[in-house]
């Protein structure tokens, strides 16, 4: 049986029905009467009696003539009595009550008329959606046939009869204080009005099949069938077979009651045939019907009571009272399935009533519903449909079938606006791209349909400039949330992209908020970029602005150069350029650039400076074929400035206020567009300023695309014979063959229409030019950066990352040039901004292109310890942390010695162009300081708030660059960089800062700091001083790709010179000759340059040594005694040793030398020594010439006092030297000790030494004379300071040497007890140090 395709059209609008609120004024209130007290009631009468009494008294006394003055007092009393009687009486008069009641009743009559008008509208709307069943026969073939779809509110709502329903309009009475005070008649009238008008009787009422799963119907068989026929008739009249299927199981299937169902297309089984055509979901056995429906029911989810727009709804009727539905598969609720069971089993009286599984009973022309405990009215007058009426309706519908190419589960309104239909595409999954992209006439270019108008005609969107007959170049679209703005934008873009190649059109989609719809176009070949989520990634907004400026400049330059080449002067527009191409000149095409700026008002709120950008591009773009569509949810005239003045066409979707609608389209119609998803995409287009708005609905392109299906089976019969068309399946005759075609093609996974088209377009033609490079969001491996930079080895240049230059539409390597003025570098960044990682990249990149003899690195790690990962790299000479102060000092010592060495060699200044330098083993040297803030706060105290080594860093920055010594530092704050150092740091790179206000990067005229655009979640991302974004390459230091071992393997046997440290135990032979001349002894090795430390006792004959126990004091004395004795004779040197603890008792002295450990011997020994030295003074009476030539005769005397703090400085209490102090004879000789041959060496404990220098006469004199001082190990908290230096916890033998110079020096003292086989270096201590 052949059928005609029914083409559904736009649904006719039903009569309007308001669902607002009618507010009713409350009835008038009567004043509450409060009875007065007895006294108040009696007082007027008492006053009246008093007045009469006064008058009688006046008359009785003979006052015949009463003056007015006499009557004044009675008159006042009369007024008071009247006031007391009437003053507080709140009781309303009867006339007043009657008047207020009449006014209110007249008001209620007006309200009643309004309510009745609302009720009439509601009834008319209900009758339109649910007409009487007798009127259904006139619907087939009309515009109303199959008008409902899943987006309509009455979809799958079947009329069941007429019932009393609540009024859709809410009736609300204004609040009153208390109903007791209301006027009774008015109150009663109001109550009567509300009780009567809140419901409407005899209104068509329906059953929503989406909210129920099984429906059980009881009652007399004929009435039940009549009711079900009415339900089915309503369902098949209003719903397309693609959205609703009907199935029936009845014993008397071929009877008059159900035989008519065979004519309906809704019962057909897709893809199955019998002898007469499509098979039908009709059966006499419910189980057989379930088998037919098995494939359809198998994959359906459980019933939820919610609409299922993506599933075809099934209405299954089981007319078999004896069938146990609860034991069948149909008892399981499934989404999109409603089962109606005609049953004869009444519910148990305690059976629970389930709203999703109603039990209905048809009785006496009405329908009742089972509620817990009994039957309740459900439908007052049930609809019934006779078998003849049903057969007539079914035959009228039998001639129609739904359109096999339409998806079915879409709005009837959008079916008429199908994207493929408007573009003439039969199958979007098999596009003829060459035909779609075929060259067009200019008047047809950029002109595409994007929807349908209110009359059903295609709405053409013409992007061309108005001078070329279009609507452009620029437009404005406004639509609130839910209005279909994204749907309309996608429709415009998909139409343009489907019909134009990248040689004619390219697109930039900029979405400030980051909607998902924008990403759908990312893979189209014409799409230059999809820029989304600019609200969170502010750098994207800056790149977008730079890209637009750059494209305008690029096109302007292209027109200028091409015009000069062709005609001698620049082309004024792309139109002239294309005319030159048409004239035969070989020029590359310039495609139209279509820019969609979605949510541009939000962009302007965060970036107000972009208003000028859009204005500039809009003005310049008119000639350069750059078209912009501005889209947003609202229109803020104060923010958009002159943008709206540059737009030609306007699109207004649903907006939030009439004023916005007037601003967009000139009238308020956009505000009055109805809300709801069924009205998404409805709007008005104003093609030109002042034109009449055109109402339209855009096509829906964001849904799943289902390609059209073709029949896979045909019926072949050799001898045609008539067959009886029955409801049940008709078996074919032996001569009939139902032949299947080829095997079913495997079904592709569901895909959206945009993705389906985009995948095909990507395989054709050229892609859009790369105007937009992706932002620096992806990590750049160091290996990739090295490959892209193309820098060769031994050029003293290496890449650090990439610089983003969106204006020029390219990325350039970020290259460090060691031989340039930017040879010193500072990296400024906040916490976790990637500073330490950047240093790793810097070192590894240099090491990848140079040998350890060409570049070497010395690192001070005050950061997170990340530089420690590079300590095994051959190019790294040392990595020192904050816990290694000695290594830090030695690093500076090595670099300063290198600087001094190169300064002394003038040839270093004459390095050749090839970088050749005198070979000192270092090459280009880099001092790398990670975290200058931490470095500057190290080695400080309350008097020295900055690290003294900062001055040495500043010296290297300002002087070292000319001698191949570079400084690379990182700092969290630019303020931490000393002023004297800043000018020497030629390269400044700024990473993300904690506060953008600390940034040093500025752009003249910009309203925002460029640092605001640096992402917070991307370490290594930053700005150059030119405000260009860059990204450091990642050093790739993971376990699998660690480059350290690979780089070291390329340079076997080569390494940067290490930082040499002082040995922890210094053997005498390690410093060479110990005795460098009279009174010149080598006592150790200096940390600064590892040179020997010479103690010149002739220049400064006084030496103080302080240190805690086992720090090396006595060991130094032992070394001095041995060295002097071994290189002197008894006639030249003599010793006086005061050793309280007998540590030096085994040291051999010269004969007759004084050694004592007895405190009683100290005073006579000092007296004898003082007399001896005093005798060396020149005698009196010598001339000046004699004095200048005079020298003392005798030996040099060494006074060695070990542990001077152990010798009491108090006067002797007994003996021959009573009252004398031990050091008094000596103190007077100390100032001339050098001239008189006296050398005094004292040692003492570190603890309390600062106090002793102020209290002990001997030590105070030493300090006054600036004696050479050695500060060995001591507790910094207990020992105080000596000449501004604090003791430190040092290894044994390590000391701070204080001389008359400004700076202290760390030294390692010689240990004479070290075994001769011990070598100089970081060896374990051999021999004791005390």
UniProtKB/Swiss-Prot annotation:
Identify the Pfam families for this entry.
Answer: FtsK_SpoIIIE
Sites where the protein binds ATP: 479-486, 829-836, 1107-1114
As for membrane topology, the entry says:
Multi-pass membrane protein
Q: Which InterPro entries match?
A: AAA+_ATPase (IPR003593), EccCa-like_Actinobacteria (IPR023836), EccCb-like_Actinobacteria (IPR023837), FtsK/SpoIIIE/SftA (IPR050206), FtsK_dom (IPR002543), P-loop_NTPase (IPR027417)
Disulfide bonds listed in the record: none
Residues forming the FtsK domain are: 456-662, 811-1000, 1090-1280
Gene Ontology MF terms in the entry? ATP binding; ATP hydrolysis activity; DNA binding
* SUPFAM superfamilies documented for this protein: P-loop containing nucleoside triphosphate hydrolases (SSF52540)
Q: What does this protein do?
A: Part of the ESX-3 specialized secretion system, which is important for iron and zinc uptake or homeostasis.
Q: How does it assemble?
A: Part of the ESX-3 / type VII secretion system (T7SS), which is composed of cytosolic and membrane components. The ESX-3 membrane complex is composed of EccB3, EccC3, EccD3 and EccE3.
- Write the protein's name: ESX-3 secretion system protein EccC3
Q: Which organism is it from?
A: Mycobacterium tuberculosis (strain ATCC 25618 / H37Rv)
């Amino acid at each position: 049986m052949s059928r005609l395709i029914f083409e559904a059209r736009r649904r006719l609008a039903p009569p309007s029905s308001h669902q607002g609120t009618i507010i009713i004024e409350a009835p008038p209130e009567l004043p509450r009467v409060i009875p007065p007290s007895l006294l108040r009631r009696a007082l007027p009468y008492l006053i009246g009696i008093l007045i009469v009494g006064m008058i009688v008294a006046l008359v009785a006394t003979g006052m015949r003539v009463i003056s007015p003055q006499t009557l004044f007092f009675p008159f006042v009393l009369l007024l008071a009595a009247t006031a007391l009687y009437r003053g507080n009486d709140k009781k309303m008069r009867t006339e007043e009550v009657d008047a207020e009641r009449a006014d209110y009743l007249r008001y209620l009559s007006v309200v009643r008329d309004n309510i009745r008008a609302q009720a009439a509208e509601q009834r008319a709307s209900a009758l339109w959606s649910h007409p009487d069943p007798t009127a259904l026969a006139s619907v087939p073939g009309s515009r109303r046939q199959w008008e409902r779809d899943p987006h309509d509110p009455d979809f799958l709502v079947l009329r069941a009869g007429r019932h009393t329903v609540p009024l859709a309009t809410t009736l609300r009475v204004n609040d009153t204080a208390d109903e007791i005070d209301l006027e009774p008649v008015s109150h009663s009238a109001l109550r009567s009005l509300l009780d009567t008008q809140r419901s409407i009787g005899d209104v068509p009422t329906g059953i929503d099949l989406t909210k129920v799963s099984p429906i059980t119907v009881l009652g007399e068989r004929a009435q039940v069938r009549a009711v079900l026929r009415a339900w089915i008739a309503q369902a098949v009249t209003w719903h397309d077979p693609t959205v609703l299927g009907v199935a029936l199981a009845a014993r008397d299937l071929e009877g008059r009651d159900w035989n008519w169902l065979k004519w309906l297309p809704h019962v057909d089984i897709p893809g199955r045939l019998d002898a007469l055509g499509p098979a039908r979901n009709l059966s006499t056995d419910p189980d057989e019907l379930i088998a037919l429906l098995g494939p359809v029911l198998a994959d359906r989810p459980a019933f939820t009571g919610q609409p299922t727009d993506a599933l075809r709804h099934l209405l299954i009727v089981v007319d078999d009272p004896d069938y146990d539905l609860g034991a069948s598969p149909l008892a399981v609720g499934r989404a999109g399935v409603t089962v109606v069971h005609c049953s004869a089993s009444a519910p148990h009286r305690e059976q629970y009533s389930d709203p999703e599984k109603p039990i209905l009973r048809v009785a006496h022309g009405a329908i009742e519903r089972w509620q817990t405990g009994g039957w309740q009215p459900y439908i007052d007058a049930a609809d019934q449909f006779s078998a003849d009426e049903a057969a007539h309706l079914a035959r009228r519908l039998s001639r129609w079938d739904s359109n096999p190419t339409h998806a079915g589960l879409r709005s009837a309104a959008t079916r008429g606006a199908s994207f493929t239909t408007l573009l003439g595409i039969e199958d979007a999954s098999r596009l003829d791209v060459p035909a779609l992209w075929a060259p067009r006439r200019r008047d047809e270019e950029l002109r595409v349909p994007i929807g349908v108008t209110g009359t059903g005609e295609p709405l053409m969107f013409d992007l061309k400039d108005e001078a070329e007959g279009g609507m452009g170049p620029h437009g404005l679209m406004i639509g609130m949330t839910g209005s279909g703005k994204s749907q309309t934008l996608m429709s415009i873009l998909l139409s343009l992209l489907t019909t134009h190649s990248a040689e004619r059109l390219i697109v930039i989609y900029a979405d400030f908020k980051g909607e998902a719809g924008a990403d759908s176009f990312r893979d189209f070949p014409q799409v230059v970029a999809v820029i989304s989520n600019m609200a969170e990634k502010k750098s994207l907004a800056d790149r977008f602005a730079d890209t637009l400026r750059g494209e305008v400049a690029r096109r302007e330059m292209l027109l200028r150069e091409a015009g000069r080449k062709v005609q001698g002067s620049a082309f004024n527009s792309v139109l002239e350029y294309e005319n030159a191409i048409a004239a035969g000149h070989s020029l590359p095409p310039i495609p139209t650039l279509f820019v969609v700026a979605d949510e541009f008002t939000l962009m302007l709120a965060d970036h107000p400076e972009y208003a000028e950008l859009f204005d500039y591009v809009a003005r310049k773009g008119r000639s350069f074929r750059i078209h912009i569509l501005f889209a947003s949810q609202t229109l803020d005239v104060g923010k958009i400035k002159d943008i709206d003045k540059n737009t030609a066409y306007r699109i207004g979707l649903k907006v939030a206020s009439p004023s916005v609608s007037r601003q967009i389209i000139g009238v308020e119609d956009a505000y009055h567009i109805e809300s709801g998803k069924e009205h998404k995409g409805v709007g008005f287009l104003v093609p030109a300023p002042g034109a009449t708005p055109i109402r339209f609905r855009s096509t829906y392109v964001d849904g799943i695309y289902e390609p059209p299906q073709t029949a896979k089976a045909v019926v072949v019969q050799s001898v045609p014979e008539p067959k009886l068309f029955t409801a049940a399946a008709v078996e074919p005759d032996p001569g009939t063959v139902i032949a299947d075609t080829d095997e079913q093609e495997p079904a592709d996974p569901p895909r959206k229409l945009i993705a389906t088209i985009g995948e095909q377009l990507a395989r054709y033609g050229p892609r859009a030019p790369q105007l937009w490079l992706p932002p620096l969001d992806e990590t750049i491996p160091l290996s990739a950066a090295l490959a892209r930079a193309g820098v060769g080895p031994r050029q003293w240049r290496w890449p650090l990352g990439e610089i983003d230059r969106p204006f020029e539409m390219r990325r350039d390597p970020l290259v460090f040039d060691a031989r340039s003025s930017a040879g010193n570098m500072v990296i400024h960044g906040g916490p976790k901004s990637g500073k330490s990682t950047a240093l790793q990249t810097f070192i590894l990149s240099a090491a990848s292109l140079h040998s350890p003899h060409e570049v070497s690195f010395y690192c001070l790690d005050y950061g997170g310890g990340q530089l420690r990962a590079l300590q095994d790299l051959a190019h790294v000479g040392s990595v020192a942390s904050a816990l290694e102060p000695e290594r830090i000092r030695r690093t500076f010592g090595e670099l300063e010695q290198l600087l001094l060495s190169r300064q002394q060699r003038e040839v270093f200044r004459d390095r050749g162009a090839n970088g050749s330098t005198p070979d000192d083993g270092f090459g280009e040297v880099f001092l790398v300081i990670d975290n200058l803030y931490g470095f500057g706060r190290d080695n400080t105290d309350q008097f020295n708030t900055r690290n003294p080594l900062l001055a040495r860093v500043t010296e290297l920055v300002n002087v070292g660059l000319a001698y191949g010594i570079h400084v690379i530092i990182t700092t969290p704050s630019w303020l931490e960089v000393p002023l004297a150092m800043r000018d020497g740091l030629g390269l400044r790179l700024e990473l993300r800062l904690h506060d953008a206000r600390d940034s040093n990067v500025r752009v003249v005229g910009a309203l925002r700091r460029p640092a605001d655009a640096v992402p917070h979640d991307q370490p290594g991302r930053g700005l150059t001083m030119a405000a260009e974004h860059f990204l450091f390459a990642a050093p790739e230091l993971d376990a699998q790709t660690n480059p350290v071992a690979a780089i070291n393997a390329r340079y076997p046997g080569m390494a940067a010179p290490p930082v040499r440290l002082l040995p922890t135990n210094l053997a005498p032979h390690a410093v060479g000759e110990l005795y460098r001349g009279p009174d010149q002894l080598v006592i150790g090795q200096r940390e600064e340059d590892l040179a020997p430390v010479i103690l010149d006792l002739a220049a400064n004959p006084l030496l103080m040594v302080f240190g805690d126990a086992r720090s090396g004091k006595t060991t130094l004395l032992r070394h001095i005694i041995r060295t002097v004795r071994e290189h002197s004779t008894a006639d030249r040197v003599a010793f006086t040793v005061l050793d309280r603890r007998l540590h030096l008792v085994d040291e051999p002295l010269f004969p007759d030398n004084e050694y004592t450990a007895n405190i009683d011997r100290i005073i006579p020994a000092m007296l004898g020594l003082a007399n001896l030295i005093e005798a060396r003074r020149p005698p009196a009476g010598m001339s000046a010439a004699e004095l200048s030539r005079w020298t003392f005769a005798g030996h040099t005397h060494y006074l060695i006092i070990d542990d001077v703090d152990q010798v009491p400085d108090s006067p002797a209490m007994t003996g021959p030297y009573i009252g004398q102090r031990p050091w008094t004879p000596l103190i007077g000789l100390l100032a001339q000790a050098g001239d008189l041959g006296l050398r005094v060496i004292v040692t003492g404990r570190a603890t309390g030494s600062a106090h002793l220098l102020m209290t002990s006469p001997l030590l105070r004199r030493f300090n006054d004379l600036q004696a050479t001082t050695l500060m060995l190990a001591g507790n910094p908290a207990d020992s105080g300071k000596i000449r501004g230096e604090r003791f430190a916890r040092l290894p044994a033998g390590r000391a701070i040497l204080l001389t008359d110079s400004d700076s202290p020096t760390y030294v390692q003292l010689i240990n004479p007890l070290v075994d001769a086989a011990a070598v100089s270096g970081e060896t374990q201590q051999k021999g004791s140090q005390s």
